[in-house]
Amino acid sequence: MISMRTHSWLLLALFLGISMLAERAHAQTNPNSNPAPSQPAADSDSPSWLFPVAKLDERLPRWLHIGGQYRNRLEGPIGIGYTGTNDFYLLDRFRLIIGIRPKEWLTFFGEVQDSRIFFNHHIANANPFEDSWTLWQSYAQVGSSTSGWVDALAGRQVLLFGDERVIGPSNWLNVGRTFDVARIDLHQSGYQVSVFASSVVPGSSTYLHRAIPGNNFYGVYGSFNNIVPNGTFEPYVLWRVAPPNPQLPEEVGHGHLNEVTIGLHVEGTLPAGFDYDTEFDGQTGSLGVYSIGAWAGYVGGGKAFPSVATAPRVYLEGNYASGTKNPAGRDWNTFDSLYPSNHDKEGFADQVGRRNLVQFRVGVEENLSKKWRIRQSFEGFWLATSHDNFYASSGAIAVPARPGASRHIGNELDLIAEYKMNKGLNFGFGYARLFAGQFLQTTTRGHDYQYPYAYMEYNFSKSGSVYGKVVRSEPAGAYRW
């Protein structure tokens, strides 16, 4: 296994080599050549020498672009598995992007990823913590996602829709999630409709990470900005099929999965600084001999106070995902969370999954300055039914069911801070603590789970990565927790 020192020297050598290429390209640039495509506005107080890749990219031919990202995160979980086990480690992730656009209507996009963990003692050197030098994205796109009315894509790509409660790349994880996909997007001003057929790419020991045969995911996802005033209306239909497979823990021992999810996501703003966000899903189909009948719902609302010095936003959230009340019967009511970006959706500690769950949260977000943002939140978790399991963020069983036991999983406190120099460079740190409730005290050793962390994220351009298919733009001022 490559050592931390060797890995750091390799990345440093790559960074310095790119810097030298950028300077050499600058010295040899023909003053009469065509200017590079304009980049999004970036903070003027950010020194350009911090972004040598951006300088090199500006001097490459118009049809060729390079970019990428480097991220470090220290984590020190305490109470792993609700026991006295602790760990402290460094997560390291490097992504390199190459985009080729010979025509406005034709794009080839490639991205490799190297994710590693160092200094760990109890956390495994495996997905989702480590997956070295893998093909993360690789696709060809015909048509433009920002002009015209249709484009088509085939290859390996990250999928991201709505609030990522159902489909997302799970970017907080060191490895994350990507798909082998074929998709067609129809778009005009005010709407986009995506039709796709895909298969999630699992972690494995191979560089290409071939998908599991028969584990397929199909969908039609619409996004309309002209139906709800000052809001977005997103209906969707998803179809998932999967074989019995030990790599799919939610299906182990139950049989073949054939499941349809019908959902609706609506979010927007209201007068007087109020905002709202809702999403509801219903599921039907079969899982082996079981008939599926499950549902989930999320409702959130907030109120901003822009006239206050820190411009706080106070918010409330409620979240429900059904569970199976009678495991001996033929009805399967456990909600399938599909492929979400779960981080912070069910707590920042990422110990709770959206299956057999009741959650309530209250919090406040504040801007200490233009670059500093903080957030504090408190939430409670309960099992929807004590006859079903307690599920982890991954969807796997965290603690088996104990019928008749208390449904109270615990309460969580989250304290989060982020300093964003610009879209290219930002830092963050925080602390989350899940206080064990009666259920965890009864079914485990009952230790609280604590999650302190600190991270640095560096994009190769101070304007952020702008290449590849635009799936959804980040709203102005959006939190990146």
Segments predicted by a language model, with ranges:
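Transmembrane beta-barrel strands of outer-membrane/channel proteins
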Residues: 68-76, 110-114, 152-156, 195-199, ...
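Surface-exposed loop and membrane-interface regions of Gram-negative outer-membrane beta-barrel proteins
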Residues: 40, 76-92, 102-148, 161-169, ...
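Gram-negative outer-membrane beta-barrel proteins
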Residues: 74-80, 106, 116-122, 160-165, ...
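Residue-level signature of outer-membrane beta-barrel architecture
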Residues: 58, 72, 98-104, 141-144, ...
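Outer-envelope beta-barrel architecture signal
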Residues: 60-66, 104-108, 148-150, 189-191, ...
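N-terminal periplasmic/intermembrane-space "pro-region" immediately following the signal or transit peptide
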Residues: 2, 9, 15, 22-87, ...
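C-terminal structural cap/anchor segments
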Residues: 313, 318-412
